[in-house]
Every structure is written in C-alpha cells, then in structure tokens.
C-alpha cells in the first residue's frame, strides 16, 4: 500500500473494510488477489504497511482478504478457532501496532461457527472433546455461551447470539490483557471493534447488536 493510501485514522480504516465488503457481497473485485511473480517481488521489496489487524475464526469459509477485498500487505490476519485471545496473538497485535502504526483491530466472529456449536453441545453433555486442548478452548468460550443457553436455549439464532457475545468478550479480553493496546486506544491511535460475518450473505456487520439477532426470526 502506498503511504498516500494509508488510512489517517481508525475510521478511515473501517471505511475501507466496509467498502471492500460491499464489493465482495456484490461479486465485484478491485484487488489482484493472485499477483504475478514481478508484483510479488515488488511487494517483498517495498515491505508491508498493514492498516488493519483482523482476529478471526479458523473456519475455512472466512478468508478475510477475500471477504474485505483486500490485497497482500493490507491486512494482518490472525486466525484461531473461536477467535479467542492468547498471549501469542496479543504479542502479534502489539508488534503490528507498534511497528506499523496500524490504527484498527477487528475481532471477527461468524454464523454457523463449529466451535460455538461444540461448546453448546458440550454444555448439554452431547459432545466430548477429543483432547485436553479442545476442552481448554471450549472452556474459554463457555462464559459467552452459558448465559444465552440458559436464557435463549430454544432461540433459532442461539449460535449467532453466542458467537457475537464471544466476539465482545474477546475485545474486552484484549483491552484487559494488553497495556500497550489499551494505552493506544486511550490515546485515540487505535480502535478495537467487533464484527460478525454472515456465511449466508457474505455481509459483515460491524458492532453487531444482540437485540437485533434476538428479534430476528
């Protein structure tokens, strides 16, 4: 990305994502996702200038570069099942924001999330994790699922409600666990926002509303 194209602040960065997602939803593309060897060399020589960090689920149907129609070097994408936070992910965010002055972090959940479903099933004694590592992941997601399972257990949008709650929980964890990122937010040099990707439509909802998903049948 040219320096002149780099967003001046988090709002401009967010607008680039919104416009890119509009293109994706409408089947349009403005970015060369498969550059030629000469273009790759240019990118390597120029270095990277990512304007956004995206923490998304490991689900193979949620490729951030395509969902937001962004090119190589535009985004730092961190992927882990359930888009939960861990020390290595926090360190990656801290490194990017301090090295590249990246102004925006997006935590991206999505509909029909497999690990959210597994957490629901685990709480209902319908799923036994195959390993301690999977159990630890489910344990981390459980606080976002338990309240909705108790209050909205039969709601058709239960998984979406839990996924959105989990996104907000991750944003809070980032702010709680990283002094560097917390200070950048206070200084208005960084914004950390929640987002939700609808697999059916391709649309990304920023700062998703739980009440909207509760009322939607």
Predicted regions: what is each one?
Residues 56-61, 81-84, 110-113:
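Short glycine-enriched loops at secondary-structure junctions
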Residues 69-77:
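Short helix-loop-beta junction
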Residues 28-29, 63-68:
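Short, glycine/acidic-enriched capping/hinge loops at junctions between secondary-structure elements
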Residues 35-40, 56-60, 64:
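Long, hydrophobic/aromatic N-terminal blocks
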Residues 55, 79, 196:
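Residues in well-ordered beta-strands of folded domains
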Residues 1-47, 72-73, 82-102, 114-217:
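Divalent-metal-activated hydrolytic enzyme cores
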Residues 107:
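Conserved functional hotspot residues or short segments at active or partner-binding sites
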């Amino acid at each position: 990305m040219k320096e002149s194209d780099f967003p001046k602040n988090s709002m401009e960065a967010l607008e680039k994502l919104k416009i890119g997602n509009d293109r994706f939803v409408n089947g349009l593309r403005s970015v060369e996702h498969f550059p030629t060897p000469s273009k790759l060399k240019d990118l390597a020589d120029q270095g990277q200038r990512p304007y956004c960090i995206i923490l998304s689920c490991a689900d193979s149907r949620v490729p951030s570069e395509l969902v937001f129609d962004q090119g190589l070097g535009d985004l730092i994408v961190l992927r882990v099942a359930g888009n939960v936070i861990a020390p290595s992910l926090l360190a990656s965010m801290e490194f990017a924001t301090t090295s590249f002055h990246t102004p925006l972090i997006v935590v991206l959940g999505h509909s029909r999330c497999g690990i959210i479903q597994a957490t629901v099933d685990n709480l209902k004694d319908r799923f036994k994790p195959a390993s301690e590592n999977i159990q630890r992941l489910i344990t981390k997601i459980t606080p976002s699922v338990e309240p909705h399972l108790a209050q909205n257990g039969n709601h058709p949008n239960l998984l979406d409600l839990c996924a959105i709650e989990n996104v907000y929980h991750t944003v809070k964890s980032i702010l709680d666990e990283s002094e560097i990122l917390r200070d950048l937010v206070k200084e208005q040099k960084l914004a950390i926002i929640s987002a939700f990707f609808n697999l059916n439509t391709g649309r990304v909802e920023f700062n998703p509303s739980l009440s909207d998903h509760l009322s939607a049948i």
